[in-house]
Every structure is written in structure tokens, then in C-alpha cells.
Amino acid sequence: MAKKPVMLMILDGFGISDKVDGNAVKAASKPNFDKYFNNYPHTHLGASGLSVGLPDGQMGNSEVGHLNIGAGRIVYQSLTKITKAIEDGDFFKNAALNKAVNNVLENDSTLHLMGLLSPGGVHSHTNHLKGLLQLAKKKNVKKVFVHAFLDGRDVPPSSAKEFIKDIEDYMNEIGLGEIATVSGRYYAMDRDNRWEREELAYNAMVLGKGEEAESAIKAVDASYHDNKTDEFVLPTVIVKEGKPVATIKDKDSVIFFNFRPDRARQITRAIAEEAFDGFKRDRLNIEFVTMTEYDASFKGVDVAFGPENITNTLGEYVSNKGLNQLRIAETEKYAHVTFFFNGGVEEPNKNEDRALISSPKVATYDLKPEMSAYEVTDELLKRLDEDKYDMVILNFANPDMVGHTGILEAAKKAVETVDECLGKIVDKVLKLDGSVFITADHGNSEQMIDYSNGKPMTAHTVNPVPFVYVSNHTEAKKLNEGVLADIAPTMLQEMGLEKPEEMTGKSLFE
């Protein structure tokens, strides 16, 4: 009997907002999405804050969104867990963090704190850096240096000076700590194996080579003078009397305070891994601690907050029922539909096929807002002809990745591209008598300007996301409002399966 696939289509960064100004989703011509939204059962889902296990009012993000969708339950995020540990004091007893601190006390060496200097809460949080500085102060560490990666994506594009001033004020207040380097996240947090970028960040932190400035603020000013916003600040070494204030050396300790793994892996490998071939470098003999587990295979790295074991995810449960599934996305979101969707497990489930389409090699995605959506679509249509899959999880990266550029016209084009692909895929699935659930993991493209100052906005939003059910059998079916964790139970109901008890989400079908 021919398969009737149940598909989840995640339009990354496609939120819902009534505001028209700066709304690329509203401005785009999207006849297919509009047709489905207006003629099929639909609702809105919470994709930020408490709805996805983040602090109240915290914008959602792709990692968190896919974790919640795949788990079928609200997954309390690293941001929330670490913040709570600081508040209740457990943070200061953490074994891995104390190991790093004790190493510098024993060797009279230096403690380096590196990570994204941002209150954005997507990859890191400034308060966690303050917690580490507090720990170092409590333990009488004498030499502490910060290697600040600058954001400009999850916060306004030119806001770094505010966060630098905040952390410098804090360090002055406690009498400990100094910024040693600054690097835009474009260089220090690449995730696409562009080692030539990471090498510049590495050279600044380890070799003391790169752009030079007398202070972090002056480094940012120089970058703004060259029309480079925070994300693109060239790795810069802070110098005093012509010498770097600090570099990472043998016997030092490094704590990487980013909690989100995907953009933290490459620079970790460059500094800490024994077997590394991204670029030529000498391996350091250091104590390296990561805030969370970036990759289970990393050797010589200690983890402060280990992974939560999430069992019976949607993928695992469907696999155990003997059904076939496909995960498909382009490079930028491949980890999201695989690793994050599976609850932080790298290994595919039994009968889980994966299709990875390369993202285009462009400096920024406004230069190619179509990204690889057409190639993803072609591959998916080909796979659907195989009559193999019971469940398909698909991600279109465009509304998010192009939304991050802050360029409205490009984001509009991104949404239009995805809509065109959406039409082809839904037509195909309906011909197979399958069903499609259309949703997003968080908002982005629906707000491309900061309403407080009229400037471009590159960050995610706290807006709800759509949830649309398209099938040949939608009569009398209605959908309740809910959260991302309710998607998996809804899909299981559509597949005629009971949800496992671990899934605390509820089916959205009334």
C-alpha cells in the first residue's frame, strides 16, 4: 500500500505579527501560504519565553524551538538552568568550573573567560560571565581576562559598546578582570567550516596577533568607522605599551561561557582538540571547560553543565514503531532537524534517513535570499517519489538566516522563495493523500525594524508562530492554540499513534 506521509514543514524565523511596518512576512507575495492559512485549520503557537522553557519574555531560537518540537514537551533550557544555578549558589560549587579555577591557583597562571558578550540569551548571557567573575573573585584568582565575542544578531547590530561598558563597570566594581580581545561573532563563532575566519579569532586570543586597539571600546569605534557592525568586528588584540594585555598560554585555564553548542564547536576544536586540521597551530597544554556539552566526542574538554537525557522524542518513538522517516535541510539548519530535534543526540534513529543540502557560500545571505531552498525542494520531491517515508521533517532556513541580515527586501524575497517551494511540496503530499503541518520555530522576518528607534532589527522576536494543518481530510477538524511542544502529539494523532507518557505536550486537534 502506498505511503501517506505526514510532514512537518518548519519555516525557520517565520513569525506572526499584525504590524505592517518592517514586516517581511506580510509584505511578501505568498499565495500558497495565504491559501492554506485561510482555507485549512490553523492556529498560533507560543515559541518564546516560558512556552519553550526560557525565561519569561526571552525570544525563542532555532535550537530551543527544534528541541521542544522534537521532544513533545517543554524542555527547560541551559539559559534557565545556569541562571538558576547562579541564583541558588550551586554554580559556585560546580566541579568543572572549580577545576579550571584550581588549575590557575596551583600554577599561578591566568584564567581566560571567552564567549559572546551579550544579554541576547541565545548563545550566552552576560550574567553568566558575571557569575564566573564572581567565582574567580571568591576563590582569590589574581589574573582574569575576557575574550569578548561581539553579537549584533540577537541584539541590535551596533550595541556592543553598551555591553562592554556594563561588563567593564562590573569588573571595576569587584576589582578583577580585564578585556584582552574582541572579535565579531562572524569570525569567532562560525559553524560552516570557514576556518580562515576562526583562525583570525584564534590568532588574536592565542598569539596576540591581529588588529590592535588600546581598549575594547576603541576597537569597536574603529570598526564602526569602517562601517563594520558588531558581528563583523575584526579580531582585535587589546594592547598596553605595544604589548597584548594577555594571550592564552600553557598551564592557563579557559572557560567558554556560551551554552549553545553549534557556534561554539569550531573555536573549541581549534584551541582544545588534539587532532585538529582546520589550520596550522600548536596545541596548548591548558584546562578547557565548556559551559555545556558542545560535542560528546570532544576530548580534553570538561563540561560544566551536562546534557539532559531526553527520551522518547518524536523521532525515536516513530522509529521504535518500525516506521521510516526523513530529515531534510540545508547546512545552516541541518543540525536543528537532526541533533536538536532528536533531543541532543547525534546518532540517527533506526530507519531515519537524512538529506543535507549545502548552503550557498556567500558572505551574507541577503546576497542570495533563495539560499538552497530550490535544491532542498527538488531533493525532497525526488525522495517522496520513493514511496518510503511515513514521516518527513523539513526545514527552510531562509526567513531566519536572511532575516538576520536586517535587510527587509532580502527577507521579503526569502519568504517568497519559501512560499513557492511550499506550494510544490504540499501539492505533491496531497497527491499522495498525506498531510502537511506548516509551522515555525520562532519569529524573525516578521519584524525587520526596531520599533523603538526605526533601525534595522537582526534579532529573533517573541511573536507566536503559525500552525497550519493541510490534508485532504480536514473536515470538522479544528486546532487549539498551544506551544511548540504540542506539535509532536498532534502529528502522532494524525499518524494514528498514542503519544508516549514522556511527552507532556497535548494534541492541538480539538
Swiss-Prot record:
Enzyme class: isomerase
Protein name: 2,3-bisphosphoglycerate-independent phosphoglycerate mutase
Listed GO CC annotations: cytosol
Protein family: Belongs to the BPG-independent phosphoglycerate mutase family.
E.C. numbers: 5.4.2.12
Positions that bind Mn(2+) 2: D12, S62, D441, H442
Keywords: Glycolysis, Isomerase, Manganese, Metal-binding
BP-aspect Gene Ontology terms: glucose catabolic process; glycolytic process
Function summary: Catalyzes the interconversion of 2-phosphoglycerate and 3-phosphoglycerate.
Self-association and partners: Monomer.
